[in-house]
Each structure stands twice: as structure tokens, then as C-alpha cells.
């Protein structure tokens, strides 16, 4: 592969950053060698406690057990809201940007406090108490954050289901976590279209007799079906409640939320996060990874239905007293300039999005970026999947005008917060690399026998010891936690991802371990081949899978989406094969290339590779559930034009 270009830390940034290179290495060494001392200091620095802890941490990876700050007590909303009021009551906590560019709102910390307390009192009036589970099925409106924080205020456990999920998916999650209350809206708005949330909720709840209350936020004012025994309008319920709600003091290890993540097989896993450790991970990573400075406007484009929205729209920024932007819309509505127009409108300093969005916007051309100023931007970030170097360079050069470092963050729903990531003032950047571990994170690379790979090498990525934001259990099924994360390599947390470590100790995520190609006995990650394909200026996006090959065992099947206006032909096909040969070697030449107008993606933007593998293998009768796809019709096109008949 071509040698990556190194982007050194700008001197001016290093001089004013929270963490410079020397401090990173000193503090990282302390976090590994003296973890109890290091984490106790950080827990006192970042969080406000009602009662101190007895022990900082204990863990047993053979049993999948971990506790942090045991015996300590705190409330999440006191940390996110109340403690800021003496100095920040009139500062903006949340900027809300509606789907319609002419609609926005600013919510101060005082207004946030009052809204959360009123919402919490509505929940209490419906019988919700500490430890009860509450399901949230909402659009990206401020009330989604209020609902989360209202649960945390009274010690209830929230389970957010992304507003794009089907009634069936919603029902499964309500049943699994035994939620008695559901919070939703009449409709959502996304890209100029209405999303029938209440109608979907009604279909789901029809199969959930345990749900006694459905609290509905009026977003569009659309007519919706109404069950007078069960349904209540939030605005009506709030008329009779107070703006004071005493916070419930929670044990550090009390549950804060359950968030479902799809398993490779079987039903979704309810990832359970607890209070103290998770909040510390959220706050620390938000401040250090984005070098957040007081008064800055921070925008994470995720939905609160995903962990990125939990940690980096709500809990991390608010714990740090930041101004966090919530966006109801999509990056391409009404035009592909929307993100950059929002950055100009609200003077956004830090912008955090997914490689999928970056590639989509890159495919639309530079003119949409060039039509805006983006002068306020200081730090850029990516999350959700590895970013290929070409998209990284475009993001850096075109969006950031070559002056904004990119934080390529690797983490998971299960880790709670960033695990491998650059820090703006400390770590030189290599496009496509998540660089180095965050404080307290001990990554290891393991071979097929579970032996540690030292120095340069490639293997399965695992974590050697506990970190504060670690998953505590799979809700209601601790055996599944052990089976999924702690049994493959006993004594380690197994991430399910493969990684390569270079001569500088930088980590490169090579894709899910089940996305490893084995061609004639040679192993390579799908991400490597995809990166080679998208080097071509006519390629917008590519996804690579293996398929059964009579000679090689596995052949390489590439799905390629071209830039807008580009017509496919055999000449281009040959150029792409040559690109892979040039970048990786002859072994990486795709055997089959299918031109794909779109790829099957979940609503969070992740490519559903299971479907790509099935189509490539011609196993069309076992495609499985496609209900969580953003556009299920994409699959029909892939099947119709498949190459391996």
C-alpha cells in the first residue's frame, strides 16, 4: 500500500490545547501504570459526587464483570445541568436546527433544567420510579434530550429506539427491556418528509400489554389515532406539574440506559451502561478528543437513537457545560450544502460526522462546500467506520481548508466512548488511521491462537483491561455478554474488529473480523480493498465481500457506486482492477465488480454487509430481515444486476 502522508500537529494548536504530545504520553503512562490514582483524579475533576466511592475499579474479564467507583453516588442531570446554573444559567446548552432551514431554537441551561424537571414530574405522575425502564422513540427534537435527562433525573433507565426503526423492531426492544412507558411524537420530519412515529408506536404497543402509558410530543400537529386510556399529550400533562424535581442520588453502578445493537445473529443485544464510569468516559473524551474550549459550539450530526448521539450530543457535552447542536434533518436537504450552511449559521467550531456522510457529500462535488465560509470550524471528526484516506483528504482539504485536524475515532456501542483516537494538540495524523489509544485503554493484537502480536502486525483487536465506559451486561442475558465479548480470547475483551499496527504504533482498523477475505490462503481486510477502489476519482463509494470461488476458495466481489453523472463501462472496470493491484497487489484484484446505484444501509448509515455477502454468493432465499434498511429497494437492484449467477 502507498505510504500515508503525515499531518503534524499545528504548533499554535498544541500551544493552547488541553493535551499536548508530552502530556499525552505522560498521562497515558500514568493511566496504565497507576490506574486507580489516575482515574480517581479524573473522576473528581470531571464529575460532581454526592458521596465518594470506596474503590476505583475492579474487574474480572473471565466473568465479564466490571465495577467503577463502587459506593460512590451521583446524579447525571446534576452533572449535566444543575451544577452549571450558578455561572451558565443563561448560556445556550442546546442549539436545535430543524429539518426546515428556517426553523431553529436555542435552549439555555436554565430552560433545559426547567424542561427536564417538568418532564421528570410527568413521568413520576405516570408511576415511573427508580429502576423502571422507559422506551423513547423520537425524532431529533429537543424533547428527545429532555426525555433522556428526565429519566436520569429520577433514576429510570431509558431505552432509545431510533425513530426510523419499524414497529416490529420497536416492539422487540420494548418487550426485551420490559418498558412500561413509551415516549414518542405525532410525527418526525426528515428531509422534508413526515415520519409516522405515533402510527408505528401504536402498531408496536398493540403487542406490548405491559405498556400502560404512551406520552406523545406534538411535533407536526398531524391527526393521529388516540387511545384515551393510554395516550397523553406531553404539553397537556406539563401544564399541571412543577419545574422543580429533586434529583435521585444514584449508585455509580446503577443502570443509566439500555441501547440495542444488532448482533451478528439472533435478536438485538441490549447493551447496558451504568452511571459513574460511563459519564466520566463521555465527559473526558468529549473534552480531550475535540479539545473543547469554553464557549465553543459543538455539533455531532448523529441521531440520539445511536450511541454516538447518547455520548456526544447529550451526556458528554452537557457534563462539560458545552453548547451542543441537535440537527433534525439530513446532510443533503434541501441541498448538499446544508451541513456547511448550518456551520456558518451557528458558528460551529467542532464538527463530528460519519464517513458515509462525508463520502456522500464528496460525491456531490466541491461546489456545495465552496458556496459557504466555514471560517468558525476548528476541529473535524469522524465516527462509525474507518474513513478511507481519499475521503479523509477531501474532508481535510475541501471542508476544513487544510487547517482543521480530523479526529478519526474508533469505539463501539459497548465501549461507551472513544477508545482509539487522535488528540488535536498531541498526535500527528495519518489519513485512515485511528492513531493511538485514549487514556486507560490497553489495546492488544491477537493471532488466531490468542497469542499477543508485538510491534508491527495485524490481528484481532482486543482490550486487555477495564475502562470506565465499558458495557456491564447484555440486559437480561449476561451469558450472551460473556459469549460475545469474553469467550473468544479468555481474559480479554474481544472487539470483533481486526486491526493493523504500524511501525509508529498507530492503529488501522481493517474491518470486522467476519469481513476478512481469504483469497488463496492470503488474508486481507475488506477495508483495504475498498480504500483502493475509492482512490479512483470516479468512485463515490465501494463495498467489498468474499464469495465462493472454485479455485481460490474465496473470490473478491466489489459493489461500486460511481460519482453523480459518471457512466460505467469496461474501461473503468479495468482501471479499478489496476488500482487494487497497484495499491495492495495482484492478490487484491476484484474478480467481480457490480455497478451499484446504492448500497444497503441501515438508517444510521452502516452498510449491511450480510446482504451483500448473500447476493454475492447467490443465496437469495436466505437474505434475512431487511426492515431496518433506509431504502429496501436497493436490494432489488442488487439482486437484478448481480454478477455471480
From Swiss-Prot:
Binding site for CoA: 190-193, 308, 520
Source species, domain of life: Bacteria
Residue numbers binding ATP: 384-386, 408-413, 497, 512, 523
Residues where Mg(2+) binds: 534, 536, 539
Reaction catalysed by this enzyme: acetate + ATP + CoA = acetyl-CoA + AMP + diphosphate
Cofactor(s) the protein requires to work: Mg(2+)
Post-translational modification: Acetylated. Deacetylation by the SIR2-homolog deacetylase activates the enzyme.
Family: Belongs to the ATP-dependent AMP-binding enzyme family.
Protein name: Acetyl-coenzyme A synthetase
Annotated source species: Saccharophagus degradans (strain 2-40 / ATCC 43961 / DSM 17024)
Lineage: Bacteria, Pseudomonadati, Pseudomonadota, Gammaproteobacteria, Cellvibrionales
